Amino acid sequence: MSEDYRTEQDSLGEMQVPADAYWGAQTQRAIENFPISGIAFGRRFVRALGVVKKAAAQANRDLGLVDDERADAIVAAADEVIAGEHDDQFPVDVFQTGSGTSSNMNANEVIANRAAELLGEEIGDRVVHPNDHVNYGQSSNDVIPTAMHVASLDALVNDVKPGLETLAAELDDKADAFDGVVKTGRTHLQDATPVRLGQEFGGYRTQVEKGIDRIEAVAPRLSELALGGTAVGTGLNTHPEFPETAAGYISEETGVTFREADNHFEAQAAHDAMNEAHGALRTVAGSLNKIANDLRLLASGPRNGLGEIEQPENQPGSSIMPGKINPVVAEAVNQVHKQVVGNDAAIAAGAAEGQIDLNLYKPVLAHNFLQSADMLANASAAFGEKFVAKLEANEAACEAQVERSMALATALNPTIGYDKASEVAKAALKEGKTVTEVVVEKGYLSEAEAADVLDPEGMTHRGILSGDDT
C-alpha cells in the first residue's frame, strides 16, 4: 500500500486514508479500532455484500429513489466486488461491532468511491455517497443478516452439497464393488455376526445422503432475507416495494431463490436459522468423522491390525519409520469435525445472545458458519476422491477372520438353542477351534447341516438358516 494518504471525512471528523485505497474514513476507523485477530471476511462474504449492494441499487433505481447514473455506477462497482476484483479493499477484522456496521460501511465506501471513479470523478469527493446512495433505504442491521443468509445458502447449495454428493457417489461405488466380500461384523469393538463389506459402505453412503437431506431441509429458513427492515425491523426510510424487489434481484444474481423475511423483527433480532443450519453442518461433520474413524480401523495394520481394507498410499506416513503409510486424509476429516464442533459452540452461543431488537453477534456467526461450510465442502470431496475411491478390499483377511469368529454361533440359536450355541462358542474359543468344528464334534449337527446353518454369506441376509433340506 502506498505511503501517500488522502483526507476523508465522516460524522466524527477527518481521517487519513491510504491514497490508493477505495475505503473511506469509517473503514479506516475500524482498521484502527479492531486490531484483534488479523482475520478479515473471506471471498464468499465479500461477494455476498456486493450482491446485496447491487440488488439494493437496482431496486432503488427501479423505484426512482436513486438516479439512473449513480445507480448504474453503483451496480458496475458492485459487479467488480462480486467478481473479486477488490477483495484487498475489505480489511476489517471479523471481530468488530456486533452488528457488522464496519463491514457494511466498508462495502458502502469501497463501492461509492469506485462508482465515483467510474463516473470520471475523484475518489473521496462523495459524488456517489456511501450512505445517501449506496446504503439508501438500508441499515447495517438488515444488510449484514441478508449477506449472512446469501453467503451461507450459497455455500450450502454450491459447495457443501456437491462435495457431499461426490463422497456419496464414491461410497456407492465401493458398496457395489465390495458387496460380495463377507467379513466379521463388530459391535462394541467385539466380534459380531457376519456382514458384507458392501453393506457397511452402503450404510456410510446413506449417512452422507441423509446429511444432504438435512442441509436441504434448512434452506427455506436461510432463503428469508432481512433486507428492508432497516434499523429495528420497522422498515423506516425504505420503500414498501424495496424488500421484494431487491430479493428478486438477489435471486437473479445468485441463481438461488430468496424472498423477503416473514417477520423482519425476528430476522434481525435473532439468528435461529443460522444456528439451525449450522446444526445440520455439525451433524454432517459427525457423520464424516464416524466414517473416517471406521475406515481407519478397518485399514489398521497392515500386519497387526484388522486389515480388512487396504488404504491408498497418499504420502509417506513417518519421518522415522520407513515404509509406514497413514490414513492422512481420514485424519484430516477427523480434525475438520473437531473444528466444526468448536464453531458450532460459538454459533450456538452467539445465536442465543443479543438484546431486544438486534442480535449483536453477526460477524462471528457469519465467519464461523462459512469456515465450517468451506472445510466440509473441501473435506468431503477430498475424502471421496483421494481416500474412499482408492480403497481396496482385503478379501483373504476378511474370509480368515469370519472363519475364526465365535459370533457365527448366533446362527445356531434357532436350530440347537441358545444354551447349546453358547456352549459351542465357549468351547471353540477355549480349544482354538472353529464353531463348525465344535458343533460337529459334539454331534449337534452333521457336517452338511453345519455347512448350511453356518454359511457366513447366508448370515448377511434377513432370515433363519436351517440344516433342514426340506
Curated annotation (Swiss-Prot):
Transmembrane segments: none
Reactions catalysed, as given in the entry: (S)-malate = fumarate + H2O
Pathway where this protein functions: Carbohydrate metabolism; tricarboxylic acid cycle; (S)-malate from fumarate: step 1/1
Tree of life domain: Archaea
Keywords from the named record: Cytoplasm, Lyase, Tricarboxylic acid cycle
SUPFAM superfamilies: L-aspartase-like
Biological process annotations from GO: fumarate metabolic process; tricarboxylic acid cycle
InterPro entries xref list: Fum_hydII (IPR005677), Fumarase/histidase_N (IPR024083), Fumarase_C_C (IPR018951), Fumarate_lyase_CS (IPR020557), Fumarate_lyase_fam (IPR000362), Fumarate_lyase_N (IPR022761), L-Aspartase-like (IPR008948)
Residues bound to substrate: 99-101, 129-132, 139-141, 187, 319, 324-326
Keyword Cytoplasm: yes
E.C. numbers: 4.2.1.2
Residues carrying the site annotation Important for catalytic activity: 331
Main location: cytoplasm
Cell compartment(s), UniProt: Cytoplasm
Entry GO CC: cytoplasm
GO MF terms held by the record: fumarate hydratase activity
Catalytic-site annotation from UniProt: 188 (proton donor/acceptor), 318
Family: Belongs to the class-II fumarase/aspartase family. Fumarase subfamily.
Note from the entry: There are 2 substrate-binding sites: the catalytic A site, and the non-catalytic B site that may play a role in the transfer of substrate or product between the active site and the solvent. Alternatively, the B site may bind allosteric effectors.
Assembly information from the UniProt record: Homotetramer.
Role according to the record: Involved in the TCA cycle. Catalyzes the stereospecific interconversion of fumarate to L-malate.
Protein name in UniProt: Fumarate hydratase class II
Gene that produces this protein: fumC
